[in-house]
Amino acid sequence: MLDYWSGNSFYTTAAYHEEIMHHKHKTNSKIYDYWGKEEYTGNYVMADLNIGSKLNVISGIRSEENITTYKAFTGLQGTLGHFTAAGADSLVTDVRENTYSLPALFLKYDAFEWLTLRYASTKTLTRPNYTDILPFYHISGLGRTVEYSNPTLTPGVSDNIDYVISLNNKKLGLLSLSIFTKKIDGLIYSGGFRYITEGTADSLYGLPDYADKYQIIEYKTNNPYPIDLSGFEIDYQTRFWYLPGMLKGLVFNANYTKTTSEVKYPRTTIAYDFSQGFPLTYVNTDSFYVDRLIDQPNEIMNLSLGYDYKGFSGRLSMLYMGDVFMSTNFWPELRQTTDAYKRYDLSLKQRLPVKGLEMYLNVSNINEAVDINRYNGFNPKDPYFDDEILEDLASQKDKSIEDRFDMIPRSSRAKSLEQHYGKTIDLGFRFSF
């Protein structure tokens, strides 16, 4: 009653809390609350052997155990959106435990003073994001949908092999050629909508039986198809110390990486079965589409031209990154890639007559490169869109929808994100002691 007489409108003399809808944001927030603890235990054994004067062998194995204990809310939201407290009434605890053995082997063979051969074989893990493994679900009765995290996700496991040839010459500098391969099992990905067929809500997803015939909005799982990635890298570093006069201060570095990958991304379509009459029967039809590995550019290039003379040092560098496959999606037109990215940076420093004192100038993103993400699809209402593209696409009836999207120029695809960072200039003094 004190709150009532003090003018707090959220409390009245009514027998129930009639202003509950004003607290919708509070219960909605509580739904996504969670608590968690992660425990990592690692043990390893390693041997470092020199066999003769030319061969070095490093081998070992790491045993890694991970135990996660997470608590999250589960529940049902009824047809009235403001009664969301039901979605935060059940606190569930889930404990996950997994153990992996990660062997590694490194070989180095100095064939000659100017030639070194290297080999590496490693096994690495990619663990799921913690928000993806919470024991959380929120069922919408009105929309017949389920927000769902998947506590059964397991880490993706990658077997990596690298071959490296290094040539080192006093005038040539250091030239390294690398070939690498990766085979990834259990890559975590988003499969989009997933229909819960009758009788599988509890057995497959750990959901209440009444969630049968609902749809999971964003279903994340481990990819059942193995993924192959391969590529090569060229790295070159040199100083032109043998040139006459002031040219001997020139420095040049270059690095180029090329990768290719092929991934089968599972794709589930929800089909209607009319053969049994009404009510209709829904079924998941599982297939896949092929694309690149997500978050992996096809090309990366770094170039750096520098000059060192007495107390002066300067570097002009360029970074080029090819387009990156950023986001999977059930709908081909909503899959996203970035535009190719190129930026220039400048770094200068000069030692001053005071011991330990130097002046520096750093200019980042000189050309003011822009980050742009694009959908595969296009926006025909864009004033810059060329209508002739529509005619070309319509005439290619024998091609798949993916092939038609490949015909669209990148500049005509709809933007999903555009970020302008501009250039930054830092001028200052640094004192080291």
Language-model segments: residues:
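Gram-negative outer-membrane beta-barrel transporters
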Residues: 181-183, 200-325, 430
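C-terminal beta-signal and adjacent terminal beta-strands/loops
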Residues: 320-328, 350-433
